[in-house]
């Protein structure tokens, strides 16, 4: 059985192309009042072009867990496995983290050269800042240096242009451990 996740959505993959939203509503008829939305999409990464995946969103995580039950449901007469799913915006949030060393800096005039930036930013590695872009990333050795840089740089002016600095985002090291082809989280 799949582990419980804090989500209010279930995914039902490998549905026939003939399955309708009505079929999904019927499959979850005992939870009709708790259902917020039902969506059917063409299944990606499928060899069979007619397969669909259904998403059923419930009001609460508790409702979702009740509907999950034993992990399967009968849709249009066929037993189908259930998976906990998250909306795309929830999945994206989990893939990035706020960096403890990198700083995103915008508002940099195009004609600013690397020497000026190095003098302004101090001891760091600079990436980005290519011609035509008014932003760059500066990576410091530790979080204390990052904090000092944020305090110093934010609202500073260079060549009359006000700079804006904030901690950068970086990819979370989530790896592929525990991910299966059919796992929709």
From Swiss-Prot:
UniProt entry keywords in alphabetical sequence: Repeat, RNA-binding
InterPro entries per the UniProt record, alphabetical: Nucleotide-bd_a/b_plait_sf, RBD_domain_sf, RRM_dom
Domain RRM: 8-87, 101-170
Domain of life: Eukaryota
Residues spanning the membrane: none
Disulfide bond in keyword set: no
Protein name stated in the entry: RRM domain-containing protein ECU09_1470
Organism: Encephalitozoon cuniculi (strain GB-M1) (Microsporidian parasite)
């Amino acid at each position: 059985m799949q582990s419980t996740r804090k989500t209010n959505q279930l995914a039902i993959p490998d549905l026939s192309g003939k399955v309708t939203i009505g079929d999904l509503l019927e499959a979850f008829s005992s939870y009709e009042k708790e259902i917020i939305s039902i969506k059917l999409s063409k299944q990606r990464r499928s060899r069979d072009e007619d397969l669909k995946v259904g998403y059923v969103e419930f009001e609460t995580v508790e409702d979702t867990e009740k509907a999950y039950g034993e992990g399967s449901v009968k849709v249009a007469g066929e037993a189908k496995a259930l998976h906990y799913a998250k909306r795309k915006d929830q999945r994206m949030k989990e893939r990035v983290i706020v960096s403890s060393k990198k700083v995103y800096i915008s508002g940099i005039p195009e004609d600013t050269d690397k020497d000026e930036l190095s003098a302004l930013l101090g001891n760091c590695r600079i990436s980005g800042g290519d011609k035509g872009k008014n932003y760059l990333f500066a990576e410091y050795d530790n979080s204390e240096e990052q904090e000092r840089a944020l305090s110093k740089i934010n609202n500073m002016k260079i060549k009359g242009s006000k700079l804006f600095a904030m901690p950068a985002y970086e990819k979370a090291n989530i790896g592929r451990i525990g991910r299966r082809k059919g796992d929709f989280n």
